[in-house]
Every structure is written in structure tokens, then in C-alpha cells.
């Protein structure tokens, strides 16, 4: 397994599409998925490879002068629980710190709504994120937005 930082926007789009389309439990809304794909091109982007096959990625989005957001992350289901997401995060966090950011945030569906998102919440907590705030209707009333934060 190797983690690389990608700079080519076409490659970022292709990786984002292939992985998000394989994860409909988390990325099943076509419009949202297309937005993630489109936005990936100019973001700080990290990709995990098994040989030459992309198996996971994440990208960061600046949300303030001192804050970056772990904007989207996906790891193919057959590669879950192998440390890939954690390694992607560690490299992204290190890069964000070197770039001068002091804080990182991530948004997900609030714990207790869907089993898939409960595991996502537990993963972010295990990385050291802390609960910051819930926006009950930011996305819609069925998907309350949990914001987690951490110091970098």
C-alpha cells in the first residue's frame, strides 16, 4: 500500500469518481457525488494505492485562514479496517500543518441516524476529532450535520 499526493486534476476526478461510485451507502445522491468529483480537481488530494489500483482517497478544502476541512474521504469497502483511512488522514494532517493551518474540521451525518454513518463517526473520533456542533437542517432534517474539529 502506498499513499501519494496527486496534482493532476483529470486523475483526481477519475479516482474520486471510481471510489465514490463504489460506495453508494455513503455517496448515493448523484448530484452530491458529482459535486465532490468536480471540486476535487483543485484541492489538496491524497490517494491510497494497492499496486496500481486506487483504493482510497481524501481531499482537503480551505474553510478559513487557519482552518482546513477534510472535505471528502472514501475507501473501497473491501479495504475497510486495514488502516488505509487512518494513513490517508495522517498524511493529510501533516501536510495541512506544514501549510500553516492550525485547525481541521470534518462534517458527517450525526451519530444515531444510520449504521454506516455511525461507523464513520467512530472513525473520526478515533482519529482525535472532537464534537463541535450539530446543524440539524444544514443538509436536510433526515441528515443532521455533525461537525468535528481538532487542532493540528
Where in this protein do the model-derived segments appear?
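A short, internal acetyl-CoA/4′-phosphopantetheine-binding micro-motif in the GNAT/acyltransferase core
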Residues: 73-81, 110-112
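Short hydrophobic/aromatic beta-strand or adjacent loop that forms the aromatic wall/cage
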Residues: 43, 143-148
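Conserved GNAT acetyl-CoA-binding A-motif
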Residues: 96-115
Amino acid at each position: 500500500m502506498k499513499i501519494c499526493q496527486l496534482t493532476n486534476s483529470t486523475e483526481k476526478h477519475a479516482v474520486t469518481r471510481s471510489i465514490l461510485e463504489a460506495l453508494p451507502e455513503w455517496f448515493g445522491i448523484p448530484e452530491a457525488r458529482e459535486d465532490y468529483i468536480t471540486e476535487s480537481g483543485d484541492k489538496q488530494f491524497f490517494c491510497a494505492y494497492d499496486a496500481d489500483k486506487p483504493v482510497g482517497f481524501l481531499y482537503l478544502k480551505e474553510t478559513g485562514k487557519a482552518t482546513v476541512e477534510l472535505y471528502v474521504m472514501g475507501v473501497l469497502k473491501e479495504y475497510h479496517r486495514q488502516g488505509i483511512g487512518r494513513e490517508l488522514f495522517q498524511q493529510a494532517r501533516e501536510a495541512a500543518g506544514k501549510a500553516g493551518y492550525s485547525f481541521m474540521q470534518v462534517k458527517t451525518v450525526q451519530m444515531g441516524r444510520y449504521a454506516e454513518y455511525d461507523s464513520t463517526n467512530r472513525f473520526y473520533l478515533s482519529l482525535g476529532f472532537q464534537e463541535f456542533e450539530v446543524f440539524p437542517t444544514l443538509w436536510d432534517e433526515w441528515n443532521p450535520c455533525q461537525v468535528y474539529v481538532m487542532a493540528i
